[in-house]
Amino acid sequence: MKSKSIMAASTVMELALAQASADPLCSTIINLQPIEYQFQQPVLIDSYFPANTDIVLDDGHVVHVTNAPTSLSTVLTDVSTSSTTLTSSASNGNGNPPDGGYLTFTVPANPDDIGNHPVTKTYPPTEPGQPGIVVIQVPTSPPGADGIPTSSVPYVTVTTTGDFPSLTGPVTTTVTPGEPGATGSVIIEVPNTKITSPSASYVTVTTPGSVAPTDAPRTSTIPPSNPTDPGTVIVVVPSSQASSVSSIPFVTVTTTGSTLNPTDDPITSTISPSGSTGSGTVIVEVPPSSSPSGSGASSSPVSVVTRTVTGDDGNGEPSTTTITPTASSGPGTVIVEVPPPTNSPSATSPGSSRPGGPGSSGTGSSASQGPSDSAALSSSTGDAGPSSSVPETSSPSRATTDDAASSTSASAPASSSAASSITQSETPSSAGAETSTPATSPASSSAPSTSDADTSSPVNPTTSSPASSAATSAPGSSTESAPSSSTSSAAANFDPCPDSLYGNPQCCSVDVLGVADVECDSPTESPTDADNFQAICAASGQRARCCVLPVLGQALVCLTPVGVSN
């Protein structure tokens, strides 16, 4: 609603009345000096603005609306000035204005209020002898900067975007029409407000799968479920190369793909580790709209704990579940559910399904090759008569299937493998038996054969062969095998906490509730394997943990190492 008020000073009215009655002989109309009036027009703005814009008022003033999207509810006072001419009627000769004398005021008015025709309002005298007042409202629009009434000029608002940081705020340019009746333009240039996602973070998860040993690792990328969660890069490596899920570290490098469109999915490529102890590299090419701030590529800085579980949701593909941190400084959790690894074609020993010769204690068997697993083979005998089979033993060292197959595939009486002849001198035998043992743990023992049989017993760190569980040792047979060099090397290179974030091995005490880890100390000696790590900490009444190096003012955050059950 719009309204206007005329503010006329009372002294001006008194001056006009005095001049109208001062000279009784004067009968002409008195034209006074033009009087300037001030118009106050309230302008109500009550609306929601989804984007920054400008509001052009009738008098040419522009109201800038910023910080959009926003709701604005306010009343502005549009102040304008105008001048008019005051006229008075003649005197009747007796010192008083004649009856029906009037003072006439001609004032401008907004056509939106009165229309396109003048409007006359008459106010009769309040007392006898006093003149009345006639107000003539003439429809007149306030002129703009070039003299053209702004109310008759239509404007078209055009909003464009400019580059940041050269444009830090809205810039308004008003183009007035060159002639009456033309359309003006209001050009509003705003900075590019497209929201750029934060640095794309990706968590790398390494898992064994059905990949041939000669093939490169297979990678798949799972985009983040929401902008604040990290994405996941799953690296599937051959089963024969994965001693554990976390033993092959991969470093994720995020870079901007110059050939990608903003709507394209990230592209991942994998560079395998250069050595057995080196780190691999996963390169994630992301679209320009989601590239990290700054130049170049950066390693993923996100603090996330990754837990891998085995499961299958039916589609045979890995799936992730992200749990956001409960505190601003705490790590988040990404649970990766991977399908169980399938049997690799190279994990079955040739000839393992062949039955043994006369006197054999069992048939050959094959074992699936999981992380750090080798194929288990049953023992076969020669022609020297009955012999006893030797139970298989486990060792953390890795035995290749090809070597094991070469030492056990021959079941003929006169055949013997090169491996059995090499290790014949390492193990005593009461009957001249030739025994091939690629690697055994220090705590395991194998019985010497009481016959002339050629026996091969490759190791299997985590999975027992069905044939080995069914075999029985001969009465009174016992041997002791010396620790192999590969076992000692594996123990010396054992890393209880291979994770780059949780890489600090600690022995921690449990709190009164039996949940949190408190008062952590370094192990008194270097662990040789997961069981040894657990035993070292258990000797002091503590639990084996892999912790994040604490920062000043931050609580200790730990995880249970792989293979530790406490």
Swiss-Prot record:
<feature type="disulfide bond">
    <location>
        <begin position="507"/>
        <end position="537"/>
    </location>
</feature>
<keyword id="KW-0134">Cell wall</keyword>
<dbReference type="InterPro" id="IPR036686">
    <property type="entry name" value="Hydrophobin_sf"/>
</dbReference>
<keyword id="KW-0964">Secreted</keyword>
<keyword id="KW-0732">Signal</keyword>
<feature type="disulfide bond">
    <location>
        <begin position="547"/>
        <end position="558"/>
    </location>
</feature>
<dbReference type="InterPro" id="IPR010636">
    <property type="entry name" value="Cerato-ulmin_hydrophobin"/>
</dbReference>
<comment type="similarity">
    <text>Belongs to the cerato-ulmin hydrophobin family.</text>
</comment>
<feature type="disulfide bond">
    <location>
        <begin position="508"/>
        <end position="520"/>
    </location>
</feature>
<dbReference type="GO" id="GO:0005576">
    <property type="term" value="C:extracellular region"/>
</dbReference>
<keyword id="KW-1015">Disulfide bond</keyword>
<feature type="signal peptide">
    <location>
        <begin position="1"/>
        <end position="22"/>
    </location>
</feature>
<keyword id="KW-0843">Virulence</keyword>
<comment type="function">
    <text>Aerial growth, conidiation, and dispersal of filamentous fungi in the environment rely upon a capability of their secreting small amphipathic proteins called hydrophobins (HPBs) with low sequence identity. Class I can self-assemble into an outermost layer of rodlet bundles on aerial cell surfaces, conferring cellular hydrophobicity that supports fungal growth, development and dispersal; whereas Class II form highly ordered films at water-air interfaces through intermolecular interactions but contribute nothing to the rodlet structure.</text>
</comment>
<dbReference type="Pfam" id="PF06766">
    <property type="entry name" value="Hydrophobin_2"/>
</dbReference>
<comment type="subunit">
    <text>Homodimer. Homodimers further self-assemble to form highly ordered films at water-air interfaces through intermolecular interactions.</text>
</comment>
<protein>
    <recommendedName>
        <fullName>Class II hydrophobin FOXG_02748</fullName>
    </recommendedName>
</protein>
<feature type="disulfide bond">
    <location>
        <begin position="497"/>
        <end position="546"/>
    </location>
</feature>
